[in-house]
Swiss-Prot record:
Pfam families: Sec_GG (PF07549), SecD_SecF_C (PF02355). This is Protein translocase subunit SecF. The chain crosses the membrane at residues 10-30, 129-149, 160-180, 181-201, 241-261, 264-284. It comes from Anaerolinea thermophila (strain DSM 14523 / JCM 11388 / NBRC 100420 / UNI-1). One of its GO terms (biological process) is protein transport by the Sec complex. InterPro entries: SecD/SecF_arch_bac, SecD/SecF_bac, SecD/SecF_CS, SecD_SecF_C, SecF_bac. It is a multi-pass membrane protein. It comes from the Bacteria.
């Protein structure tokens, strides 16, 4: 039988290796918030000639109009995305008019979104509240669902630990993506994050439920061996549900979808994979460490982590 729990500290190290680089990038460059959360304007335009001006030329145009923080990116559909501080419809009309005359082309506005700074902060606060409520609901639900198990709240706390792991991986991913590819944390990202949280909890309930069932059957079996046996039993189900269905669909969207959906699909792709990963390699090992009291050895000088 696979001895997954015997290598738990190796998997903890792998998780840290995935999370820490992104957190370092975030500490240096900050979280790439979109206008949804910090306020500002997003203008997407298309040129009739299909010939796009250089981003520097568009930035210069904005500067001439007194907008000094414009950021320009091109998309795979021959359009320009311009992010800037908040501008109203009148200023947007002047920008488009200036583009028409300066670049001698016909410009079509495909999208224009503006969010004031106050509204952006309010949305950010509500998003944080939504994630916090989701985390609290997870603890309450799992504690209630496993109420017949000794120390049922530990199952809920370990699920939250693993869920935080998944969230940190996703945040690390978008932080690095923000620097390399111009990704931003927007409303679509929040949708992906909440989806990851929901799937993550569901997968952990499956693993924990098998541990609960086996604890009634193998009453005299060591808890670590029982948990490892339960993980092996659910491993095929998790892989089949994850890799053979959802991940293939998301991979197709990431490879062939539009630029807006691509970031969403990649975040979901990684996040859902992490949901399965953390159920096996983070949540269950954390429960074993807590149940066995192994964590007390961490604070003893010269003590080595226990291994199976």
């Amino acid at each position: 039988m696979l001895n997954i729990l015997g290598k738990r500290y190796l998997f903890f190290a792998i998780s840290l290796a995935m999370i820490i680089p992104g957190l370092i990038v975030m500490a240096i460059f900050g979280l790439p918030l979109s206008i949804d959360f910090k306020g500002g304007s997003l203008l997407e335009v298309e040129f009739a000639s299909k010939t796009l001006p250089a981003p520097a030329e568009v930035v210069a145009l904005y500067n001439d109009l007194g907008i000094t923080d414009a950021q320009v990116t091109t998309t795979g559909n021959n359009t320009l995305l311009v992010r800037s501080s908040f501008i109203d419809d009148d200023v947007r009309a002047k920008v488009v008019q200036e583009m028409n005359s300066r670049f001698n082309d016909t410009v079509t506005v495909l999208r224009f979104d503006s969010v004031g700074p106050t509204i952006g902060k309010e949305v950010a606060g509500r998003a944080t509240l939504a994630v916090s409520i989701a985390a609290l609901a997870v603890i309450i639900y799992i504690t209630w669902a496993f109420r017949g198990v000794h120390n049922a709240f530990r199952y809920g706390v370990c699920a939250i630990i693993a869920m935080i792991h998944d969230v940190l991986v996703v945040i690390s991913l978008v932080s690095i993506g923000g620097v390399l590819f111009g990704w931003q944390v927007d409303a679509l990202f929040l949708t992906a994050l909440l989806s990851v949280i929901g799937f993550s909890v569901q997968d952990k309930v499956v693993v924990f439920d098998r541990i609960r069932e086996n604890s009634q059957i193998y009453r005299k079996l060591d808890f670590e061996k029982l948990a490892n046996h339960s993980i092996v039993q659910t491993l095929q189900r998790s892989i089949n549900t994850q890799l053979m269905t959802v991940e293939y669909m998301l991979l197709a969207i990431a490879l062939f979808g539009g630029i807006t959906l691509r970031e969403f699909a990649i975040i979901l792709l990684v996040g859902l994979f992490m949901g399965t990963y953390s159920s096996i390699f983070i949540a269950a090992p954390s429960l074993v460490i807590w149940e066995s009291g192994e964590w007390r050895n961490w604070f003893k000088r010269g003590a080595k982590p226990a291994s199976a």
